[in-house]
C-alpha cells in the first residue's frame, strides 16, 4: 500500500472524430510502439467498415459489442489453509471496460483476415452479434465464476 495516498487517475481525451472516450481507449489499446496515427487509421477504418456492413452508426455497434464483451464476474485465487480456491468476485466498472477492450484487440489480432482493419471490424461485428472469440472469453470467465460459486463466502 502506498504511504502517500492514492494516485489520481488521468482521464483520456475524447477522440476528435466520434467524440467518445471509449474509442480513444480502443485506439490506445491498438497502438503498438507509440504509433498513434497508425492506430487511429486502423480504428477509424474499422469503424467505417462496421457502419458499411451493419447499416447502423459505428459507435452504436461498438457500444453494443462492448456491452457483450465486458465481464461482470471473474475469479481470483485466494489461499486459505494450504488450499487455493478460485473465488468469484464482481469486476469493477473501469476494469470491466479495460478487459473488454483488451480482449477485443487481442482476438482481432488473432483473426485470419488480411488487414488489421478487417480483423477489428470483424471482431466488433461478431461481438455485437454476441458471437466471436472475445464474447466466448467472457462466457468462459462467467462459467468459471458460476462453477466456483460455493467459494463466494471467501470474498475479501
Curated annotation (Swiss-Prot):
Keyword annotations: Ribonucleoprotein, Ribosomal protein, RNA-binding, rRNA-binding, tRNA-binding
Domain of life: Bacteria
One Pfam family matching this protein: Ribosomal_S7
Any one GO molecular-function label of the UniProt entry: structural constituent of ribosome
Listed PROSITE patterns: RIBOSOMAL_S7
Cysteines paired by S-S bonds: none
Keyword Ribonucleoprotein: yes
InterPro entries cross-referenced by the UniProt entry: Ribosomal_uS7, Ribosomal_uS7_bac/org-type, Ribosomal_uS7_CS, Ribosomal_uS7_dom, Ribosomal_uS7_dom_sf
GO biological process, one term: translation
A Gene Ontology cellular-component term: small ribosomal subunit
Signal peptide boundaries: none
Biological role: One of the primary rRNA binding proteins, it binds directly to 16S rRNA where it nucleates assembly of the head domain of the 30S subunit. Is located at the subunit interface close to the decoding center, probably blocks exit of the E-site tRNA.
PANTHER family recorded: RIBOSOMAL PROTEIN S7
Subunit (UniProt): Part of the 30S ribosomal subunit. Contacts proteins S9 and S11.
Family: Belongs to the universal ribosomal protein uS7 family.
Name of the protein in question: Small ribosomal subunit protein uS7
UniProt organism field: Lachnoclostridium phytofermentans (strain ATCC 700394 / DSM 18823 / ISDg) (Clostridium phytofermentans)
Lineage of origin: Bacteria, Bacillati, Bacillota, Clostridia, Lachnospirales
